[in-house]
Amino acid sequence: MEVKIFRVKGTFEKGGKKFRFTKEYRALKPEDVRELVFSDIGSKHRVKRAKIFIESIEEIEPVEAENLVVKRLSLELA
């Protein structure tokens, strides 16, 4: 199986306010990315999974990645 890059867009609620986010992850499948988002945002912002709303998970090419760590890892290993 090949590791792919995914871009995730969504929102989360904290303290009655909504915050938008865009994250990029390396994973095998979209289901893995979904769990990474819940884990990452939940731990950093102390938000429950029910307050995290994922709008889209899209697969992108390594050159499209904005996160430099994800981009370099993907280009070096390709």
From Swiss-Prot:
One Pfam family per UniProt: Ribosomal_L18A
Keywords: Ribonucleoprotein, Ribosomal protein, RNA-binding, rRNA-binding
UniProt protein name: Large ribosomal subunit protein eL20
GO biological process, one term: translation
SUPFAM superfamilies in the record: RplX-like
Transmembrane stretches, start-end: none
Subunit structure: Part of the 50S ribosomal subunit. Binds 23S rRNA.
Originating gene: rpl18a
Record HAMAP family: Ribosomal_eL20
Keyword Ribosomal protein: yes
Superkingdom of the source species: Archaea
One GO cellular component term: ribonucleoprotein complex
Keyword match rRNA-binding: yes
Taxonomy of the source species: Archaea, Methanobacteriati, Methanobacteriota, Thermococci, Thermococcales
GO molecular function, one term: large ribosomal subunit rRNA binding
